[in-house]
Amino acid sequence: MAKSVERVALAGASLGTARHLMVHHYQPANATASSRKIYIQASLHADELPGMMAVHHLLHLLDAADRANAIQCDITIVPVANPIGLAQVINGYHAGRSDLAGNGNFNRHWPDLFAGLQDRVADKLGADPVANAVVIRDAIKADLAERSTLDEAEQLKLTLSRLACDADIVLDVHCDDDSLMHLYMPAEHWAEYKDLAAELGAVACMTSSDSGSFCFDETFSLPWNKLRAAIGAQYPIPAAPFVTTLELRGQPDVFDELGEKDAKAIYRFLQRHGVIAGNPGPAPELLCTATPLDAADVPLSPASGLLAYKRNLGDRVKKGDLLAELIDPLAEDVAAARIQLRASNDGLILSRRQSKLVRAGDYINMIVGTEVLSHRTAKLMTD
């Protein structure tokens, strides 16, 4: 076995600054160019720290597996995926979700790797799907190698994309605001990889193949799906890599005990899928089933005010049930200072905002149902 730790430099946007990624590589002794690869990163939204804690514990487990010669596939781990956002502290408040330089949400607008892909592979594909997979991966890697940018956040995206683009399994580890455990994944992968939801104890798994936001995980699945749709009748195009976003509860849930528990769950998942030798035992009983992303709703505040929640995380509600009351502390008539906020669908209260001071249009919570909602379009609900 061989483990290496690579320090990948990023060009600093300001004089006198320098940033870097620490990348942990595990490679079995018999690895080849066609060996399976696993990529895991944490805290792309840099203020979402439960993933950073879980990956810290996962590295301990992987180091032990490496010493025991138990690692069977290439594994790449980036425990801190966003040093730019990590430094964005304003008067003691960590603002790590969006780039303060003006590029918006760090998990939006990742490279479109389908653009030009069909032309790159057109004269190289054949009847062998395994050989075609190599051709497609090589084309995507070549595309990324040719790209360049002077923008710091875009350079971060290119660097992480180059690390992840040839992986068979991609785990992007996040958390929500105030939340229970849940996942996002493409519906076509649920049957094979639902044990990840079981191991983590997820209470929801929302499925979508294209959220329309060019998020990190979809960057690596969409090219395969779009290529298959374009030329799959002519050539056998293999299934896209398994990509998933793990939401490890909420931002406050940063504890050794939870991080260790989540790391062990991910480790058992990797064992079950042949990445690490050993018997993980049977998968736990699932606490959820996969539901379409557009069966989930995020009620918005109709005005500004103070939130007073009337239902808790994990509660199941019906359409019309009272969720919260919005209080106007400046109302002249105190008796008329409250607006009732009600559920617009049946489902589970999965997450909610921590800040109780809201503006008009701010989200209140997320209710995950099973029936597709007419006003939803399979797009992400918050930015």
Annotate each language-model stretch with its function.
Residues 1-383:
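Structured catalytic-domain cores with a bias toward divalent-metal coordination
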